[in-house]
């Protein structure tokens, strides 16, 4: 990717939601909500405190994260639809993604 976010910003690629419910009902595109889950594809260096000291970001490329429905700014970079958001817009990191898929 030819983009490097500045300060405490990250670039997130949305992860599409399931197209079927647990009961097997197919959800049409018009009824789907925007996914609030994504994968970090780029990370800025971090913010600065009042003394000018760098505060590194606690996220890394490849992390799967949860964020608010209206978080970030939608952009198109290299033909891909991505979100640019501040680290503070991210609610948390999903850990152990592989175990969740095995249980389903």
UniProtKB/Swiss-Prot annotation:
It is found in: Cytoplasm. Keywords: Chaperone, Cytoplasm. GO terms for cellular component: cytoplasm. GO terms for molecular function: ATP binding; metal ion binding; protein folding chaperone; protein-folding chaperone binding; unfolded protein binding. Signal peptide: none annotated. One of its GO terms (biological process) is chaperone cofactor-dependent protein refolding. It comes from the Bacteria. The keyword Chaperone applies. Its main location: cytoplasm. Belongs to the GroES chaperonin family. Heptamer of 7 subunits arranged in a ring. Interacts with the chaperonin GroEL. NCBIfam families: PRK00364.1-2, PRK00364.1-5, PRK00364.2-2, PRK00364.2-4, PRK00364.2-5. Together with the chaperonin GroEL, plays an essential role in assisting protein folding. The GroEL-GroES system forms a nano-cage that allows encapsulation of the non-native substrate proteins and provides a physical environment optimized to promote and accelerate protein folding. GroES binds to the apical surface of the GroEL ring, thereby capping the opening of the GroEL channel. This is Co-chaperonin GroES 2. It comes from Rhodopseudomonas palustris (strain ATCC BAA-98 / CGA009). The gene is groES2.
């Amino acid at each position: 990717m030819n983009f490097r976010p500045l300060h405490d910003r990250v670039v997130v690629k949305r992860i599409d939601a399931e197209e079927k419910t647990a009961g097997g009902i197919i959800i049409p595109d018009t009824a789907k909500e925007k996914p609030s889950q994504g994968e970090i594809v780029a990370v800025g260096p971090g913010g600065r405190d009042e003394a000018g000291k760098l505060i590194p970001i606690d996220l890394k490329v490849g992390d799967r994260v949860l964020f608010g429905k209206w978080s970030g700014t939608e952009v198109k970079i290299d033909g891909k639809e991505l979100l640019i958001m501040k680290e503070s817009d991210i609610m948390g990191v999903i850990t152990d993604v592989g175990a969740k898929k095995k249980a389903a």
